[in-house]
Structures are given as C-alpha cells and as structure tokens.
Amino acid sequence: MLVLIKHPLIEIKLTEMRAAETSHKVFRSNLDEIASLMVYEVMRNYQTKPKKVITPIGVETIGKSFDREVVIIPILRAGLGMMQGILAMVPEARVGHIGIYRDEKTFQPIDYFFKIPDVPKDSYIMVVDPMLATGVSANDAINKLVNLGFSNIKLICLVGVQKGIDLIQKNHPNVDIYLASQDEKLNENNYIIPGLGDAGDRIFGTKAK
C-alpha cells in the first residue's frame, strides 16, 4: 500500500527543502521535523497493550504501551537525517543501521554495513530513507530483513517516484510505503525530478550546491 501523507506543515517544510539556496542547517532541521510529523501517521495502526502506572498523587491508572518492539532502521547515510525526528516521538525505539551506497556508473547498490538489534521477528520495523528513486537500495535493505524473518516492515521516505514505488510493491507487496510527496520522474542520472538534490550531501553539507 502506498500512503501519501499530506499536511500543510509538511508541504511548507518540503518546499523550503527543495530550494537550492536552503542551507544544510535548515534542510536538516526540516527533514527532522517532517520525519516526526510523518511517523504519527505511520504508527497509527500499531497495536498497544495495557500499562499500569502510579501518578504523582499515588493513584494507579491503566494506560498503554506498544505491544512489541519498535525498530528504526535508517539506510546510511541519508536515512540518518530522519532518525532523530522519529526517536523524538518514539524514544524507546531500538535503532539498526544498513549501509548501502549506489555505484555511480552502474547505479547498483553496494552493501557495506548491516547491524540491527536482537529483537523478535514480529517487531515493528521502520526502514527510513529520504529518497525513493530507483528503489534498488530500499529493496535491497528490505530483502535483508525479510531473509532474517521480519515481516512487519514499513518504508518511510520523504519523496519518491513511480519507478521506485513499483519495484517495492512488486517484490514486497506487504510492505507499506509512506511518502510526503510523489514526484514526477527520474533524470538520466537517476536523480528525482523535481526532487531536492542529493539528500545526503544536503544533510551533512558535504558538497556545494
């Protein structure tokens, strides 16, 4: 299932991120805030269980907690830009990391790091990456998780295009995809159009715009 999360705050912050003159400081801050706004919708159907607490005046009451582990898995490196925004909403979440970069000539994924928490296979897994372009990196990351036995996986991206969406939906029809914007297309270098440039470079300020 594809879910487009529409909200004026998200749309305004995304517009600022698209602008070439936006500093990496503002870009990073906006991405962090959009991730917080998106995860509210992503977690809407997560199940809870009763949790007993004692209030400051000594009264016992029953509230709620998630019924299983929540795990955030950013695809390095750009996915790190969404991690803190989600952790702000779910501070108890575990964090894993999957390192994948795209070969600039073949556009194929190159794996270089994989480490995730030791959690039950029915845990709530959120794979995060700002860009869903060809979908190859996200597909590779999801493949690794599925091969380990995880099934409750959601993919959260800021912007994406149909090509990447189609690849994930074809290979992983049970993985829900959440986007803030579905953009028009990819250019000859597989950059999203209109997009927002290279998300990793703009998050970390590693290349002049």
UniProtKB/Swiss-Prot annotation:
Catalyzes the conversion of uracil and 5-phospho-alpha-D-ribose 1-diphosphate (PRPP) to UMP and diphosphate. Uracil binds at residues 192, 197-199. Its EC number is 2.4.2.9. Binds 1 Mg(2+) ion per subunit. The magnesium is bound as Mg-PRPP. Belongs to the UPRTase family. This is Uracil phosphoribosyltransferase. GO terms for biological process: UMP salvage; uracil salvage. SUPFAM superfamilies: PRTase-like (SSF53271). Pfam families: UPRTase. The gene is upp. PANTHER family: ADENINE PHOSPHORIBOSYLTRANSFERASE (PTHR32315), URACIL PHOSPHORIBOSYLTRANSFERASE, CHLOROPLASTIC (PTHR32315:SF4). Allosterically activated by GTP. Pathway: Pyrimidine metabolism; UMP biosynthesis via salvage pathway; UMP from uracil: step 1/1. It catalyses: UMP + diphosphate = 5-phospho-alpha-D-ribose 1-diphosphate + uracil. Keywords: Allosteric enzyme, Glycosyltransferase, GTP-binding, Magnesium, Nucleotide-binding, Transferase. 5-phospho-alpha-D-ribose 1-diphosphate binds at residues 77, 102, 129-137, 198.
